[in-house]
Amino acid sequence: MYLLLLLIMLNMLMMSMIYLFMLFMNKMKNNLNLIIGNLIIINLLLNLFNLNWIDWIYIFCNLSFNMYSYGLIMLTLWIFGLIFISLNNNSLNCLFMNLLLMISLLLVFLSMNLLLFYLFYEFGLLLIFYLVVKWGYSENRWLSGFYLMFYTMIFSLPMLYIIYYIYLIDYSLNFMLMEMLNLNLNMMLFIYLLMSFLVKIPIYLFHGWLLKAHVEAPYYGSMILASIMLKLGGYGMLRLMIIYKNEFILIQKILVMINSFGVLILSLMCLSQFDMKSIIAISSIVHMGLMIMSMMTFLKISLIGGYLMMISHGLSSSGLFFLVNVIYSQTNSRLMFINKGMINFMPSMSLLWFMLCSSNMGSPVSLNLISEVMLLIGMISWLKFMMLILMMYCLFSFIYSIYLFMFINHGKIFIMFKIKNGILVEYFVLLLHWIPLNLMFLKLYFI
């Protein structure tokens, strides 16, 4: 009892210190972005003790949350809170679009109706398209926006017909009812429905749009894409796996085979990239490929591991994209050949590079390690032969993470002008990426 009271008092003290620190930053930089970000972070911290109270489902007007969506809702609020704190763009249009996108993504995770899920899902894609083409870095942002809309809409528009077909057969689009009815769907329609989610994860062979979008998107667009938008596909797959388990079993070996080769090929591609954003974007596809591959085993440990992978990767990839922006804002380049020897200019930021790169490759005690161990156990339990492929994945993941860190922070210096070590807000945002990523293992019983 006394230990519980002590923990609560320490938590209140920590929140008070963070709140005072945020107020201090508001005095230093008084704008609406920081105020909104502060409110989101504080409200989120107040709910951290409720993570184990998610066994029940609250339903109101087809909106609900349960174990599958609660963690992703928390991730969405956390990432957008950090984005609002770090925004340098004082445009109300930019702030409004990010707020609208946050609400849209929250409604996706809260939707218990397939049609509402689809509508909010596509509305979020339109908003991220607008962010890319409006605040992108170069003229190629229009081409990136075209890739984004072409790859996603070519599978998303027929999904509306499939939803209508499901309603004609089952007379309901409610996820809870569809789970209880144990429904079956025509195999061709099921594959098309599944592809609309796999393209957005994205699966190997359909990943071209993500690389284009990441390279041209503003830093907050990349943070949203990597940490939340990719997880929409994984969340949709989780919902479908419960409803259409028989159909998934028929194609599980095909998906495992495609993703096992894709994980290895894309890991090698990381070692041939010179753009920092490209390496982080490809590593995101690799992590999502491992998640799909393991979830296809339908083992409980694999499903939990995939769920934790979505949360952990959302934090680590978002932090890495923010680090790239810290360098880009001073050198106007993302090429690793130019941005070398950064440890001489910004030693404190180099430490954060190492902390987030090590978390990204699954080092102790990050949540990435726990999720990857669960996924590897699930795969090896399903098929012993997968051990060889998974060993190669772990090796390549370590190599490209160290390659990214070493190439940027060490080596001969090419930059001849002065670089600052970073500002207070940047360190605060980066620490709020790393701290929950490495402390969440203390409270895993909520799963």
Curated annotation (Swiss-Prot):
The domain of life for this entry's organism is: Eukaryota
Primary enzyme class: translocase
Question: Which catalytic reaction applies to this protein?
Answer: a ubiquinone + NADH + 5 H(+)(in) = a ubiquinol + NAD(+) + 4 H(+)(out)
Q: How does it sit in the membrane?
A: Multi-pass membrane protein
Q: Which GO terms describe its molecular function?
A: NADH dehydrogenase (ubiquinone) activity; ubiquinone binding
Give the location in the cell.
Answer: Mitochondrion membrane
The transmembrane segments are 4-24, 34-54, 67-87, 100-120, 149-169, 189-209, 223-243, 248-268, 279-299, 304-324, 349-371, 388-408, 422-442
Task: Briefly state the protein's biological role.
Answer: Core subunit of the mitochondrial membrane respiratory chain NADH dehydrogenase (Complex I) that is believed to belong to the minimal assembly required for catalysis. Complex I functions in the transfer of electrons from NADH to the respiratory chain. The immediate electron acceptor for the enzyme is believed to be ubiquinone.
- The name this protein carries in UniProt is NADH-ubiquinone oxidoreductase chain 4
Q: Which organism is it from?
A: Apis mellifera ligustica
Higher taxonomy: Eukaryota, Metazoa, Ecdysozoa, Arthropoda, Hexapoda
- The UniProt gene name for this protein comes to ND4
